[in-house]
């Protein structure tokens, strides 16, 4: 049983473990505390996102979607090992799970089969979503697995927990398969070895890129709201391609698509290659400032 870490303490714990951490938007106040209790905390739960692409995955986990409001976890672990903090407090990640599993986590004993869904896991578990399609084919880079190990160990170290306080979603709720592609027993072994030693200490963050990396074509869809879209729109206006009546703004719109199509035509694209949906080459040439 433990009082949840404050935003500052969580951030410090992760960085002290050697992780590169990005604070995403207003993560410190992004939570579901108005829908239910947060704490006491008992463990860490690992998930996969069933998505690809860092930027779109982070936005999804921050905002959630119509069927499941965000945040969908506390941190998103990217393929390159970067941890993007998206929530602080209760998050929609664990759902209902097995009370026998919770008792085993608290006692730090071997887990029983998860055959019931009768206990609110969002109250008791920190959640990390890891960017992976979850199809058993999408690879888990070494940097990402190391970051999962470090992130889970960081929270455990801050609370004085052992590796048995870390579980996968598939060990909590019947029918879940995540994380798929590595075993939780192997990950717990890694976490246990790490906890036997001292934390790695703060890492030097890589330099922030000058321009926004291409977030993938699927990022540009109806319902998307992101400061990246605003920054893109401002660059389109600067290039003489703005087709806005009002804006640019954060919500992806028909005006954004028409403006981007004008940019594609300016670059010499025609037909379906100038449909207004960004591609990597045209995006890189637009040089959208980092936000």
Predicted regions and their residues:
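N-terminal catalytic cores of peptidoglycan-degrading enzymes
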Residues: 1-121
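LysM (lysin motif) carbohydrate-binding repeats in extracellular/periplasmic proteins that recognize
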Residues: 238-243, 254-270
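Oligomerization/assembly interface segments of phage tail-like spikes and tubes
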Residues: 46, 126-130, 226, 230
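Acidic, glycine-anchored loop motifs typical of Ca2+
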Residues: 248-250, 273-276
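Short strand-loop junctions, especially beta-strand C-caps/beta-turns
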Residues: 49, 131-133, 249
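Acidic, Ser/Thr/Pro/Gly-enriched interdomain connector segments
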Residues: 197-250
């Amino acid at each position: 049983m433990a009082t949840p870490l404050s935003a500052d303490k969580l951030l410090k714990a992760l960085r002290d473990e050697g992780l590169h951490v990005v604070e995403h938007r207003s993560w410190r106040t992004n939570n579901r505390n108005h829908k239910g209790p947060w704490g006491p905390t008992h463990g860490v739960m690992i998930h996969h996102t069933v998505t690809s692409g860092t930027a779109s995955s982070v936005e999804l986990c921050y905002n959630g979607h119509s069927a499941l409001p965000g945040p969908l976890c506390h941190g998103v672990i990217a393929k390159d090992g970067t941890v993007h903090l998206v929530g602080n407090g209760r998050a929609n990640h664990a759902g209902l799970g097995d009370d026998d599993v919770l008792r085993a986590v608290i006692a730090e004993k071997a887990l029983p089969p998860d055959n019931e869904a009768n206990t609110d896991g969002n109250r008791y578990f920190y959640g990390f979503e890891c960017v992976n399609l979850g199809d058993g084919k999408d690879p888990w880079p070494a940097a990402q697995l190391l970051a999962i190990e470090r992130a889970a160990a960081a929270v455990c170290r801050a609370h004085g927990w052992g590796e048995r306080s870390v579980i996968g979603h598939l060990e909590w709720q019947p029918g879940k398969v995540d994380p798929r592609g590595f075993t939780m027993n192997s990950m717990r072994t890694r976490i246990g070895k790490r906890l036997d030693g001292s934390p790695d200490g703060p890492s030097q963050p890589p330099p922030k890129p000058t321009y926004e990396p291409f977030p993938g074509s699927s990022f540009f869809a109806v319902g998307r709201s992101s400061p990246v879209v605003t920054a893109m729109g401002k660059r389109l206006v600067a290039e003489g391609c703005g087709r806005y009546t009002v804006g640019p703004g954060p919500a992806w719109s028909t005006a954004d698509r028409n403006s981007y199509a004008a940019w594609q035509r300016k670059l010499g694209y025609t037909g379906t290659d100038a449909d207004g949906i960004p591609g990597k080459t045209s995006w890189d040439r637009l040089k959208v400032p980092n936000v």
